[in-house]
């Protein structure tokens, strides 16, 4: 009898141990799944990333006897579309969306990377200090989007900013017209390999309810060979590699 009691006790202990290990393993799998896949049913989703690459010449004040004396900038306009999730049952409102932790993971061979927000509603960019993005930028939720005043509709909208490479190159010419696109880089003997770069940043969606979701975005610029194609673009709608997690 005593041997049976001890045997049953050992079995019971082993079963409890097995259940404990199983529960821990299950919790571990859930945590791993969340780490890999992130939030699966957010109130608002990042639905699209559009990047438009080209180049422009900024006319210098002193041109001498020449028609053109321009500093050449390689530009990459970034559009992040935030869309309301129709499958989310509860009502939520966007408080703000922040771009932060901006890093240049791979620097270009020539030039200096800087980020700017538009100076007006027509997405015109003035490269002045007050439009420059330094460590972060916050777009406040409002009734409707207002690019100039850094506002986004609290039910979803589009965030716009520019990644610019101030190449340090110039082009001087007496041509009557100057084509402002990526082919301008060739005139300054700049090739696509010279200006390749990789930028990453976090996008944080904060709701009025106090919940925040953060995801990391990585962008390679310019898109394709802008020096020969003039204007190139990337329209990304598959967001599997952008994992959002609650903060």
Stretches found by the model and what they are:
Residues 8, 18-19, 45, 202, ...:
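Compositionally biased, low-structure terminal segments
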Residues 9-11, 194-197:
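Charged, low-complexity, helix-prone segments enriched in Lys/Glu/Asp/Gln
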Residues 1, 205-207:
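Hydrophobic, Leu/Ile/Phe/Ala-enriched alpha-helical segments that form helix-helix packing faces
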Residues 199-205:
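Short, structured surface segments that line ligand/substrate-binding pockets
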Residues 2-23:
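N-terminal Sec-pathway targeting helices
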Residues 31-195, 210-247:
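Non-catalytic macromolecular-recognition regions in eukaryotic signaling proteins
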Residues 22-33:
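Hydrophobic alpha-helical membrane-insertion segments, chiefly the h-region
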